Amino acid sequence: MEKNTIILAAGQGTRMKSKLYKVLHQVCGKAMVDHMLTQVEKTNMDHIVTIVGHGAEKVRELLGDRTEYAIQEQQLGTGHAVLQAEKILGDKDGMTMIVSGDTPLFTAKTFENLFEYHRQKGAAATILTARTENPFSYGRIVRNEVGVVSKIVEQKDATTEEAEIKEINTGVYCFDNQKLFAALHQVKNDNAQGEYYLPDVIGIMKDAGEIVAAYEMADFSESMGVNDRLALSKATKVMQRRINEEHMVNGVTIIDPENTYIDYGVEIGPDTIIEPGVQIQGNTKIGSSSVIGAHSKIVDSTIGNRVTVTSSQIESAIMHDDSNIGPHSHLRPQAEIGEFAHVGNYCEVKNAKLGARTKMGHLSYVGDADLGTDINIGCGVVFVNYDGMNKHHSTVGDYAFIGSNSNIVAPVTIADHSYVAAGSTITNDVNKFEMGIARGRQVNKEGYFKKLPVYDAALKAEEENNK
């Protein structure tokens, strides 16, 4: 039997107060509609149709050919939105599930259970329901004395007795595909908003004597919809807890899960330790037995095994096995740190490679350069790579030594086994076994201190200290 899904993603989302299309707002690094599509894909659909309207091109750009699309030109209600999929699904048999693109917390397991329950019941329609102690604002599921669904009643229309019902409509449905579109053509818009509502299909099917079932899901939190920034924050918190728990189950130590922020899709190996305040975002992979120190931020990067990151920021970079960085250093895009290499405190690396066992202890900048293995970079070294118009590249060979407070003015090549004396500004190549030294010769002027303004201040301080 064919399985289809329609994702409703045409709403404008005015309550978000945003220029960004509502379903494109992110929850843990992934757009809400992308979360939904990912879970739907896991249930092996024959057809997936996304209903788009406002912001259609941006949704298409994000989701690509993972789904088919139908356009709702006018916002005339959820029933009208589903009807736009008829030209794609109208001649199909089987089952069709309808979900919303602004409910990012649903799981594939819940959808699989819904399809199976619908099939077992032989129903024309199955409503996905949940129980909550605070059902206010949700439609209530009214059942008869034998547990069969009688109707869905909205909050504003509920009697006092009906308002006490804890079972609510999550807004997800599974239908017999042919009966769905037949019923949609009978939906009227004789309401205050002049819209065609999808839940009216349930009443039409009941009146026609069709079987209408309800499957109660286990976790109410999955059904959380996002209509404003407050709900977005709540959904993000639920998703973050889910992500962190999955990593911990898989062998990752997260010291403070409530204050650790890991995007959906991030990969972390076992025995890695994540300290409080860490943010791990985008397409990031972290190996095993690494330590990500407090308040570090890692974005779109690959971190190897046994790597230590101490309070540093890493973006679009690579750290190979057994390397370390920090505290308070920054790897910018296209930085690559070799095995056992060391980047200490207050350093920055951009579009540059540090080879294995190369050490860069403190207060240095390496940009647009290739550095070999076993190099020592002293304190305050700067690779001068920009002439005001263009970036230029430098190369440093294996076993070289770059003395403190040196400037390497690109483009230059510093060969294997060469030495740059501290305080030098290097503008020419340094060959193998050579020492490059480029600094003014020191001259000591006898008695000159007494001619300087600071001399009087120093005498006064000395007199005060000797009293």
Swiss-Prot record:
The protein's annotated pathway: Nucleotide-sugar biosynthesis; UDP-N-acetyl-alpha-D-glucosamine biosynthesis; N-acetyl-alpha-D-glucosamine 1-phosphate from alpha-D-glucosamine 6-phosphate (route II): step 2/2; Nucleotide-sugar biosynthesis; UDP-N-acetyl-alpha-D-glucosamine biosynthesis; UDP-N-acetyl-alpha-D-glucosamine from N-acetyl-alpha-D-glucosamine 1-phosphate: step 1/1; Bacterial outer membrane biogenesis; LPS lipid A biosynthesis
Record region (Linker): 230-250
Enzyme Commission number(s) of this protein: 2.7.7.23, 2.3.1.157
Transmembrane parts of this sequence: none
Cystine connections: none
Positions annotated as active site in the UniProt record: H362 (proton acceptor)
Biological process annotations from GO: cell morphogenesis; cell wall organization; lipid A biosynthetic process; peptidoglycan biosynthetic process; regulation of cell shape; UDP-N-acetylglucosamine biosynthetic process
Cross-referenced SUPFAM superfamilies: Nucleotide-diphospho-sugar transferases (SSF53448), Trimeric LpxA-like enzymes (SSF51161)
Swiss-Prot/TrEMBL cofactor(s): Mg(2+)
Residue positions binding acetyl-CoA: N385, Y386, S404, A422, R439
Major localisation: cytoplasm
Family: In the N-terminal section; belongs to the N-acetylglucosamine-1-phosphate uridyltransferase family.
Record's function text: Catalyzes the last two sequential reactions in the de novo biosynthetic pathway for UDP-N-acetylglucosamine (UDP-GlcNAc). The C-terminal domain catalyzes the transfer of acetyl group from acetyl coenzyme A to glucosamine-1-phosphate (GlcN-1-P) to produce N-acetylglucosamine-1-phosphate (GlcNAc-1-P), which is converted into UDP-GlcNAc by the transfer of uridine 5-monophosphate (from uridine 5-triphosphate), a reaction catalyzed by the N-terminal domain.
Protein name, UniProt field: Bifunctional protein GlmU
Gene: glmU
